From Swiss-Prot:
Organism expressing this protein natively: Brachypodium distachyon (Purple false brome)
Spans annotated as Disordered: 34-56
Classification via Pfam families: Ribosomal_S14 (PF00253)
Record keywords: Chloroplast, Plastid, Ribonucleoprotein, Ribosomal protein, RNA-binding, rRNA-binding
Keyword Repeat: no
Protein name: Small ribosomal subunit protein uS14c
Quaternary data: Part of the 30S ribosomal subunit.
Amino acid sequence: MAKKSLIQREKKRQKLEQKYHLIRQSLKKKIRSKVSPLSLSEKTKMREKLQSLPRNSAPTRLHRRCFLTGRPRANYRDFGLSGHVLREMVYECLLPGATRSSW
């Protein structure tokens, strides 16, 4: 089980990312726009605005965690579980449609 503080930190990052998502997206779109090209000084101002946003609001700072244990590694996106929790749940027939492989 991951520390509670790490799980809370990750939740805080998710909230920040959702809060600043549209702002970050619009600034990036304006910087990359080829339809109405900006001058160099305008682009630097846009980049400064982008850099002034909180670091934890960047989507690259997010990390998937197992929603049961909070483990940050070996996560399966389809289930939202880490590998060993997924394996245990499949063995106990708690996941519908998932079966053990045998050959």
